[in-house]
Amino acid sequence: MFAVIKAGGKQYKVDRNSVIKVEKIDGELGSKIQFDQILMIGEYSKPSFIGTPIVKGAIVTAEITNQLKDNKIIAFKKKRRKNYRRKAGHRQELTELKILDITKQ
């Protein structure tokens, strides 16, 4: 069974026991969270349920396995011949989740 969830403004296709990285979700390691914004749910051998915009009664349960930071992204601006240079770095904070269960009531 698979589902398409919405987390942090992005969409992720998840299966049971899959591990995904989403934008930071506050919580302690090992704590369980539930996603109720499920956009699509289905099985590979049967037709899928597509939400309008979400599937009612569908819940995805996940466990927080890690809190980490992504690689640094450099933003650099320059104007030629004017000695104007600006450099900024950014590291996005991420949460690693393990999908435990996908249910539809």
Swiss-Prot record:
Do you know which SUPFAM superfamilies this protein is assigned to? Answer: L21p-like
Query: Could you cite one Gene Ontology molecular function of this protein?
Result: rRNA binding
Q: Which domain of life is it from?
A: Bacteria
Cite a GO CC annotation.
ribosome
BP terms from Gene Ontology: translation
Q: Which UniProt keywords apply?
A: Ribonucleoprotein, Ribosomal protein, RNA-binding, rRNA-binding
What does the UniProt record say this protein does?
This protein binds to 23S rRNA in the presence of protein L20.
Indicate the quaternary assembly. Part of the 50S ribosomal subunit. Contacts protein L20.
Family, per entry: Belongs to the bacterial ribosomal protein bL21 family.
Q: In its UniProt entry, what is this protein called?
A: Large ribosomal subunit protein bL21
Q: Which gene is transcribed and translated to give this protein?
A: rplU
